[in-house]
Every structure is written in structure tokens, then in C-alpha cells.
Amino acid sequence: AGSSLNGGSMKITYIHHSAFLAETEHACLLFDYFKGSLPKLPEGKRLYIFASHRHPDHFSKVIFDIAAEHGDTVLLLSSDIWRKRVPEELKGAAVFLKPDTVWEDDVLKAETFRSTDEGVAFWCTVDGHTLYHAGDLNHWYWDGEDSQWNENMTRNYRKEIGKMEGRHADAAFLPLDPRLGEYFYLGIDDFMKAADADWIFPMHFWGEFDVGARLKALDCSRGYRERVVEISRQGQEFSI
């Protein structure tokens, strides 16, 4: 059984690492899947499979098997993924997106932002819902890294997040990476200062499920800590 966050009509399933499945009235959105147990996909809903970049913890050719099995599927792939990776029979379903691109069909609108690592982040509007999946767009401020590198990172991340100024997402999937040590919260904190989200789903936390609780314990999260979803296991479902 799933957790009802506000009893809404969109179902979110945490799969693994940065992979989530969102199900709305007419669509299913699968983000950055490379492994993990996938819920049964309902027939009659278009499947959108997103891959934010080519890193193996965000992209796998297994998504092409999922697409072939489901049928009505659109593959929304970052332009850094090699086109020749896509099987011939799925080439017509694949769209390669650079940063700062808008793509839409009769169900979904997807906008891309430039990652501070590789590839893109996705801002999606579907069935009256808005979702933001950051991919690896994050404030990667590493302890021990060259100070100039970290300053550039801060500037680049805040510039990109600034493009989202005033936007609102029903669900935001954001990296909360414990490898960053004391700076692990910066990406989410900057995002919430620029934009807004009803629910923040941490991701990219390498199995450390307590990161949400750790973020909530920080003073800086006072204004949004009630909206941080504490994910406790793979396969966990939420209704929002």
C-alpha cells in the first residue's frame, strides 16, 4: 500500500537511485531508470521514458526493452546519449533533447535545463500536474575540491536554477547526495529559494535513506521541511 501525501490523483513510485515512476490520468513518466523492480505499467497510457544523461547510474539500454514491451512510448533522451544506442525499431519514438529545449505532444510538455554535470534536467507538465526531475543538475560543492572550481559550480548552479524563478512543481525530484558531506543540502536549498514544490523527493542518495531526515533537521530547511518526503525503501509508492 502506498503513502497518501495529500490524496491526489498522481502516483509516484521510488524505484532506485534517481529513478521514479509517475502515473497520471493519461500517462506514465519513467525517469532515469537503469535497474530495480518496475511496477506493472497500465495499458492504455502513454509511457514517457526520460534519460537525463548517459552515466550508467541514470541510463541503461534496458529502457528500450521496456519501451518495446509497452508499445505506446516516447523516449526523451539527453543529446549526450549516442543515437546509435537506440534500436532501429525504436528510432521513431526517440527524441534527443539539448538543454534549453521545449518538446511537447498532445499529452505532455517537457522543458530541459543544462546540468552542472552531464546532460539535462526535465520540467514536465502533464494532465494538469508539474514535475521537475533534476537528473544530475545539482550544486556539486565538494569538500577538498579547488576553491575556484567550487565557486564556478555555485555560480553555474544558481544561474540555472534562476531560470526556474517563481515556478511551482507538484513534485520535485532533487539530488541529496551524502558524499558531499556538510554541503549535501545546497542543491535543494537553492532550488527552494528560487522555485517552489509541494513535495520534494530526495534522490541520488546511494542507499542512505536517512538523508531526508538529515535535511529536515537542518535550520535552513525550516521553511520547507514538511514537504521533504522521507523515502524508506525501493518500490515505495506515494499519492499526491
Label the model's feature ranges.
Residues 10, 71-75, 199:
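Short active-site oxyanion
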Residues 35-84, 162-173:
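Active-site metal-binding motif and surrounding structural segment of the metallo-beta-lactamase
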Residues 36-39, 54-59, 81-85, 118-120, ...:
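Active-site environment of divalent metal-dependent phosphoester hydrolases
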Residues 30-31, 50, 76, 131-134, ...:
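Structural motif
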Residues 42-44, 61-64, 88-89, 145-146, ...:
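Short amphipathic alpha-helical segments
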Residues 13-17, 87-103, 185-240:
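Binuclear metal-ion centers of metallo-dependent hydrolases, dominated by the metallo-beta-lactamase
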Residues 157-162, 181-190:
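A short, acidic, amphipathic alpha-helical segment used as a generic capping/interface helix at domain edges
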Residues 5-44, 93-168, 233-240:
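Core dinuclear metal-dependent hydrolase active-site scaffold
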